[in-house]
């Protein structure tokens, strides 16, 4: 699995219908009906750790293939 930055993940989530609810510092909170609040850490262009990315994808109902297709 390739790692991506928090910024890139945010852009992908927004294309999938997630809406930015609020942000506090470097953490962006996204919401989508039927899913729990998703907190994405955004630290510039620094890549997310693989475990963090996998957990966020799982919570968002997405797969690694969804990222590759974008």
Task: Outline where the language-model segments fall.
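N-terminal first-folded block
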Residues: 1-24, 29
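Long, low-complexity, intrinsically disordered polar/charged segments
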Residues: 1-11, 35-36, 59-61, 65-68
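C-terminal structural segments of small proteins and small subunits
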Residues: 44-70
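A short, structured beta-strand/loop element
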Residues: 20-51
């Amino acid at each position: 699995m390739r790692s991506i930055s928090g910024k890139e993940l945010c852009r992908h989530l927004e294309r999938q219908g997630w809406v930015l609810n609020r942000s506090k510092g470097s953490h962006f909170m996204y919401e989508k009906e039927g899913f729990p609040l998703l907190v994405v850490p955004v630290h510039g262009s620094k890549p997310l750790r693989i475990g963090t990315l996998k957990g966020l994808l799982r919570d968002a109902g997405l797969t690694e293939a969804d990222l590759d297709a974008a």
